[in-house]
A protein has these predicted regions:
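Glycine-rich beta-alpha loop elements in corrinoid/cobalamin-binding modules
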Residues: 1-115, 122-127
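Conserved Radical SAM active-site core
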Residues: 1-10, 140-144, 148-261
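Short helix/loop capping segments that flank catalytic or ligand/cofactor-binding pockets
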Residues: 19-20, 27-29, 120-124, 130-133, ...
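Detector for methionine-enriched segments
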Residues: 21, 33, 86, 129, ...
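Predominant activation on well-ordered alpha-helical scaffold segments within soluble catalytic domains
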Residues: 27-30, 131-138, 197, 259
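N-terminal [4Fe-4S]-dependent radical SAM core
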Residues: 94-98, 102-164
């Protein structure tokens, strides 16, 4: 459908939205819900409970009444209302730029957008995961197989990645056509060599493994172990790219860790 839709929170009638790579917000949400059930003695979490709980959890979104949202000049950012964006492509483009900038900040602001149904509230993301947290996520016992509903069907995309190893998250390329920064941020979080080698070992035991890996890579370009030399400077930066229009002098783009791996 060639139209500018409202937030998926409005269209889907969902109580809570989790965005980005969801491990941290899902753990925080379920832990908070468990604590609520223990404290209240209730048998289940209601829709109202879920909305109330999510308001204090990063990397979630919810739909609120206008009188429920107190604007904080320092920590909030107002987007142009959906109705105004329907009349102006420039305002929609400005919204996209604002969202892109906030997704690239160390200390992002909360985003607010008014719709006919209420105010869409998008809480800022969690801090970048640690290597230990990322290892834990990748070390879970995945089957490495397509969903069972594809049984017997060839999936070209699966053929390309089945013997591939993801070694980091995040991308500081800032390409205009890409939304990786909105999903994963521009700051790189790396898996340990031990975790990567455990996955390589698992791949080597696959029935169709021929003895070579298709690639060791990131979500796009390979930026393993690359980072800002001075993180305090990074905290003040909202550039979508560390390499365009020219490479940032604060970027440590040393390839030695990748070569060692």
């Amino acid at each position: 459908q060639d139209s500018l839709r409202k937030s998926i929170l409005v269209d889907s009638k969902a109580d809570v939205l989790v965005y980005g790579m969801g491990e941290q917000p899902i753990i925080a949400l379920t832990s908070a819900m468990k604590e609520h059930l223990t404290a209240s003695g209730a048998e289940y979490v209601t829709a109202g409970d879920a909305r109330a709980i999510s308001r204090g959890i990063r990397q979630t979104g919810y739909l609120a009444r206008r009188d429920e949202v107190l604007f904080d000049e320092e920590n909030d950012r107002r987007l142009a209302p959906h109705g105004e964006c329907m009349k102006s492509k420039e305002k929609q483009a400005a919204n996209f730029l604002a969202i892109e900038k906030e997704s690239n900040r160390v200390n992002a602001k909360r985003l607010l957008q008014e719709t006919d149904e209420g105010v869409v509230v998008i809480n800022p993301p969690f801090p970048t995961m640690t290597t230990e947290q990322l290892d834990h996520s990748f070390d879970l016992p995945y089957t490495r197989l397509p969903h069972p509903k594809y049984k017997g069907k060839r999936i070209p995309a699966y053929d390309m990645i089945k013997h591939s190893v993801n070694i980091h998250r995040g991308c500081f390329g800032g390409c205009a056509f890409c939304t990786i920064s909105a999903h994963q941020g521009k700051f790189i979080v790396n898996r340990s060599q031990e975790s990567i080698l455990r996955e390589v070992e698992a791949i080597s035991r696959m029935d169709d493994f021929k003895g070579y890996l298709s690639d060791l890579g990131g979500p796009s370009a390979n930026m393993y172990m690359m980072k800002g030399k001075n993180r305090e400077l990074c905290a003040k930066c909202s550039r979508p790219s560390c390499i365009q229009p020219k490479i940032c002098p604060n970027l440590d783009a040393d390839h030695s860790p990748l070569l060692e791996l």
